[in-house]
Amino acid sequence: MKRLRRLLISLMITALMAAGMPMTAFAKPDWPSDTGIESEAGIVMDADSGAVLFGQNIHVQKAPASITKILTALVVIENSSLDDTVTFSHDAVYNVEDGSGNKNAIEEGDTLSVRDCLYLLLMRSSNQAANALAEHVGGSRDGFVKMMNEKTAELGCENSHFANPSGLNDDTQLTSVYDMALIASAAYKNDTLLTISKDKSYRLPATKNNPDGVTIQPEHKLLITTDTESPNYYPYAVAGKTGYTSVAGQTLVTYAIKDDRRQIAVTMKSTQATHYQDTIALLDFGFLRFENVNISENETAYTSGDQPVQIGDNSYQPSDLSMDTSAVITIPKDASFADAEKTVVTDLPEHAPLGAVALL
């Protein structure tokens, strides 16, 4: 019996960035490049294709502050049960940076489920929840940090090093807007994490200082603003995370959906006056100037005809090949699929599907 081979098509058009200046694989037309953001670093990435639609200093390392907690949540969800019980140790509660606060007045000995802690982590940005979850999942904070850095390597992050699960100041806690976009893209593909991040409120159970429980809400203004006249009203925002320290400045991750297109925007080293408006500018830029095109509907050279197809060192019959029907490329709206430069890659990554023979 002839063994069916599958040609994995995961073509994406990406803008290469150098010192914030976009360059493109297109000969025509020019890649759009005008967003006018004021943050020191910013990016908007298509979450389906992985294409960088605009970037400014995208590989420059900066302190992330509490957007770190997106990575923390992802590692926790992948390595624990939501119904596990987490006990807050003395170290989890009190071994934090002076002045960093204690959201919801958690005390040593308080117990919450992993689910409760994740809501406290992502909605209220609790450093105590970050520490307690790290101890629960990693056995220690250091053990969990090792898991965080292993996860970033798995996701292809090349300019990141995490030293704690909360994002509090540490000279070695550094990442880039590009790496954070990779992390966020993976995180919001996780159904549990996305559900928690989308919720507008959550009821925490009783703790020592809140014996009747307490209702918490997100802090990300683009997620909670309902006044259509507000400059922070953005109905396409679905999920995200805020961050701030004296070193990092304002940092922000936002996941938005419009017309079935999904985008990730990240800004770092911003100010209170600019980070939300920069994010809206980035997201609008991506939604208005780009579109996604299905690859399998436009690329037929490998799967049609009766002549053998050469891929790398091997030859295949077109009838033995198929394409990933969900794969898309992101292109400017004034470009076409024919404008894309195509490269066949046969050195496949470890996570490639069984039977895949190439990436296009």
Please describe what each predicted stretch is.
Residues 2-3, 112:
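Membrane-helix interfacial "entry" motifs
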Residues 157-158, 172-174, 178-179, 184-360:
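Domain-terminus/edge residues, biased toward the C-terminal soluble/receptor-binding domains
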